[in-house]
Amino acid sequence: MTTMSAISHYRGGTIDVVTPVAKKLKAAYLKHGIVYRLSRFETGPNLGDWLVVVQYDQAAHETLQAAIAQDAECQQAFAEIAKFAKRISRELVLDLDL
């Protein structure tokens, strides 16, 4: 299995605001076999910003995109996130098995 990661940088929202929504999104993603990780920058010019990494099987990329688009829990979480955070960047990377 080849794993793909989507790495996103977000700006906005406090820990108290972001955490409950992130927990909901993580649970919704897990139903689709997507791994979700949230981190907060603690140094540098992005202090206080968020780094989100989601990982999934590359072969399932298109299928997962369609499933997420139809998943009400995911769409609700995306709408909530948009109220307090702005996505600064998003990159898709292929994970290498070394």
Descriptions of predicted regions:
Residues 2-9, 37-69:
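Short, well-ordered beta-strand segments in beta-rich or mixed alpha/beta enzyme
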Residues 20-37, 55-91:
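An amphipathic, aromatic/His-enriched active-site/gating alpha helix that lines ligand/cofactor pockets
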